[in-house]
Amino acid sequence: VELGSTAQVGDIKYRDLNGDGVINADDQGMISEYGGNPRIQYGFGLNINYKKFDLGVFFNGSAMRKIMLTGIHPFGESDYNIFKFVAKDYWTEANPNPNAAYPRLGLQKANSDNNVVPSTFWMRNGNFLRFKTLEIGYRFCRYGRIYVTGDNLAVFSPFKEWDPELEWYKYPLQRTFNIGCLLYTSD
């Protein structure tokens, strides 16, 4: 293998795509024609009024989206911390699980570069549906309304490591709740 460093037990295995018996840069190909850009972004909402009550909801999401786990690799000499999801299931000599979720860790860049080559191994499904906003209100008189709102209430996604809408190093979107009262001066 000539993709970064000499392959060792516990490393990611690569395919000889061009069939020449050598795994090198000539065996690399496009793995996602859209990269991290989703092919579909969507949003939908609903507002309902019934007597003195009102309800509003909004959802947004992304489909046909891929996430590359780049920059998270706990390999080499760069003082990287290890993400919990990597630390829970990686290959070691003490636990040589051939089905470990992540390859062996390396302390020296020279002997672990094989595990950081961009490949489908690091690609994840980044589809998500976010329950973005909920607002419930009550008009208690002709000139007044009380309400409660919630933002970023839930995210449904097969990708569980972090918010699929953001990169791993970004501060996550906060879940917020508000209670308010509106007083109108006229119709």
Residue ranges and their predicted role:
Residues 58-60, 147-151, 182:
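Transmembrane beta-strands of outer-membrane beta-barrel proteins
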Residues 52-56, 142-146:
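Repeated loop/turn-to-beta-strand initiation elements of outer-membrane beta-barrel proteins
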Residues 50-52, 61-65, 133, 150-157:
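Transmembrane beta-strands of outer-membrane beta-barrel pores
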Residues 45-47, 135-137, 149, 180-182:
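Outer-membrane beta-barrel architecture
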